[in-house]
From Swiss-Prot:
Organism: Rhizobium johnstonii (strain DSM 114642 / LMG 32736 / 3841) (Rhizobium leguminosarum bv. viciae)
GO molecular function, a single term: tRNA (guanine(46)-N7)-methyltransferase activity
Family (UniProt): Belongs to the class I-like SAM-binding methyltransferase superfamily. TrmB family.
Protein name: tRNA (guanine-N(7)-)-methyltransferase
HAMAP family: tRNA_methyltr_TrmB
Keyword Secreted: no
Chain's gene name: trmB
Recorded GO CC terms: tRNA methyltransferase complex
Keywords: Methyltransferase, S-adenosyl-L-methionine, Transferase, tRNA processing
PANTHER family referenced in this protein's UniProt entry, alphabetically: 3-DEOXY-D-MANNO-OCTULOSONIC-ACID TRANSFERASE/TRNA GUANINE-N 7 - -METHYLTRANSFERASE, PENTACOTRIPEPTIDE-REPEAT REGION OF PRORP DOMAIN-CONTAINING PROTEIN
Amino acid sequence: MTDMERRGRATEAFFGRRKGKALREQQAETLNSLLPAFLIDLSAAPPEPLTSLFPVPVERLRLEIGFGGGEHLIHRALETPSTGFIGVEPFVNSMQKLLSRIGETGASNIRVYNDDATQLLDWLPDGALDQIDLLYPDPWPKRKHWKRRFVSKTNLDRFHRVLKPGGLFCFASDIDTYVNWTLIKCRDHGGFEWIADNAADWLTPYEGWPSTRYEAKARREGRSSAYLTFRKV
């Protein structure tokens, strides 16, 4: 990456902290031993076909941006072993949790990236992905910080480029302003069609959806969630 690209990326601050509590010795060992085997190296060109990132045969490719505790990602990977999953998470503690679960379950259809998701998106070839999941992203609730929200014209352009024709962008949130923001951004972009006929289509969790800690927290605090699905057109 050039110095100019680094300066440009400095303005794309979509995430906050990189670390939480200090990892215990065993947790640090898990992270250090497993991360190299699952980490995508962006200094190398994307392999052809991209499915060869995985040591097992996969038919579809799915990206989850900001996987948090990894509950959803590991659930989907075990549920659909014929899909290759790429998870992006810059938060060290969350990455350790996912890698620990990978070690426990033996899931081999997952690869990860531990920095800014826009770097990975720009590395991916055109039309590479079947689906992108952005689930309970940081809402940046203060209006002055809304420009930091991951859903933006620039990132929707990225999504549109890397999705296959008819590929899906799935967005879940319990923050009404972010749900409305995403609907407006996707409508104005013009490259995405919202798949919804009635309220049940966005108030009902996705098929096979595992409850996550973020969703549980929202319910405890009296907030309902929206589950939006957009198709690339």
